[in-house]
Amino acid sequence: MKTRVAVISIIIRDKNEVEKINEMLHEASDYIIGRMGIPYRQKNINLISVAVDAPEGVISALSGGIGQLPGVTVKTAYSDVITETP
């Protein structure tokens, strides 16, 4: 199986979606290298950056699923680091 390193950047404008996002990230926890959350109180938004090493399909599904939530914006940056695992 080929895995790829990527960073998923999430901007949350609707705080009601935070619990759903955390559930989705928990489901993908086997692939998460690390994450950082920053509350930006002056703008009333939250920023989350998630580093992953996963198959492209998993990254795409996670990013797409989170991006479907109302009040949430997602962008994913893929590295050229691809690893073949048995």
Where is each model-derived feature located?
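Long, contiguous binding/interaction regions
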Residues: M1-P86
